[in-house]
Amino acid sequence: MADLFVFMNGHDVGKYIQHRSGAQEFVYNDLWQNAEYAIPISLSMPLTETKHKGDVVYNFFDNLLPDNKETRQRIQSKFGTKTNQAFDLLTSIGQDCVGAIQLLP
């Protein structure tokens, strides 16, 4: 299992988790859920105490990256990631995503 800490506008909001099987999850941390100013990172993943699983998680994080396969392959080559899938690429470049989201190992 591997995980990335997810930040939004500098606030630690949760973890993006990938299991050895390839299954992915996202879970909000307790401090963020209980903050009066907390908002979800996506309307498709509301603030809950349960883990978000499946396509909704994969699609959200995958959409932080370029769609173009060649661009993903260049990122993979430059950073030496195992694959050009979202979790692997975001492990290397997630600190500099578009928008308010950052991912850190």
Residue ranges and their predicted role:
Residues 1-105:
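Phosphate/dinucleotide-binding and metal-coordinating scaffold of catalytic cores
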